[in-house]
Amino acid sequence: MRKTILLAFALFSASPPALGAPPGTAQNFLDRANRLKAKGPLAFFDSDYGRLKAEATAVGKSIGDDRIADERAGRPIIYCSPTARAKLGSFEFIDGLAAIPAGERANMSLKQAMIRVLQRKYPCRR
């Protein structure tokens, strides 16, 4: 019994790509979003839809708050939208995530990925 448990643990811990990207990564978010996108209008009834939306909204709010804090403190800002709360549509965000190379996307947080998408949309002219 003990050997079976150890073998199962070794198999699952040795092959994380087979299980998908770890939670919280940009790749995990994109995988879940693409799964919902494939459902078409029925995606709105999937329980993961609300979680994805809340996750993206929370990350966006955090980035906006960071930008406001940077402006107030006189630090350089990381993206240059006309307002601190940048506009980013859901499909625009998903397409931006897909444009990030898979190797990088698998190792970056959703916040880092969203910042990269915002920097591409709203580059700073320095």
Mark where each language-model region is.
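Enrichment for repetitive, rod-forming helical segments
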Residues: 9-10, 39
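N-terminal signal peptide c-region/cleavage motif recognized by signal peptidases
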Residues: 13-15
